Amino acid sequence: MFTSDIAIFLLGLIAAIFGGYFGAAIGGNFAFTLTGFMILFSWGIFAVGGSDIGFNYVAFGPVMGPHITFAAGVAGAAYAMHKGLIESGRDATSPLARLGRLDVLLVGAAFGAFGYLFNIGLSFIPWFGSHIDTVALTVFTSNVLARLIWGNGLLSPQNYNKGATSFMKKIAPNDTYFWLRYQEKPGQYLPLGFSAGGMAAAVS
């Protein structure tokens, strides 16, 4: 029997497919930025009408949730690197629409659908689903899945620092493999985190 719950579920799935396609098209980081704006927009809806639909359906839902759009951008980048279309799968910033490849964006759409379904599945797990951030865990799981499918395994031993004796030294950033050089040391990221947290606390 076709019920309203089924209709809402299918509508969400369709939205997630489009959201994943869009997230891959504009790039994961830009998609995540839009999620932030959608959160502000959702607060406006809540303040005016008391409705949380903006949070549940848009900002953290199938439209612009990070488990949909950001995760899709990451998966699309991993696939594009595997196909030799971009240099690094870590590039979650560049819009993938610039590649002109439909298959890359369809990967994003597929991971958008995966994020939607996996997040719902987590929420139905007794106790566990109500005591964790299912959206964050879905993002993590989606990214690991993309790595396993299109990366060189979960880890890349061939890229370890040669001569290192401990695991942490083997995977330590070097001149070839790094994320943000200006945020690698505690003296760099701790003051930044403290000041950003203090600023947010002052506004609150």
Model-derived features: where do they sit?
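Membrane-water interface at loop-to-transmembrane-helix junctions
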Residues: 98-103, 165-204
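N-terminal signal-anchor module of multipass membrane proteins
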Residues: 1-63
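Membrane helical hairpin/interfacial module
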Residues: 35-39, 50-92
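Transmembrane helix-loop junctions in multi-pass membrane proteins
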Residues: 26, 44-57, 79-86, 114-126, ...
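Membrane-helix interface and helix-disruption motif detector
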Residues: 1-6, 50-62, 92, 117-136, ...
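Membrane-interface helix-loop-helix junctions at boundaries between adjacent transmembrane segments
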Residues: 85-165
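Hydrophobic core segments of alpha-helical transmembrane domains in multi-pass membrane transport
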Residues: 15-21, 39-43, 71-78, 108-120, ...
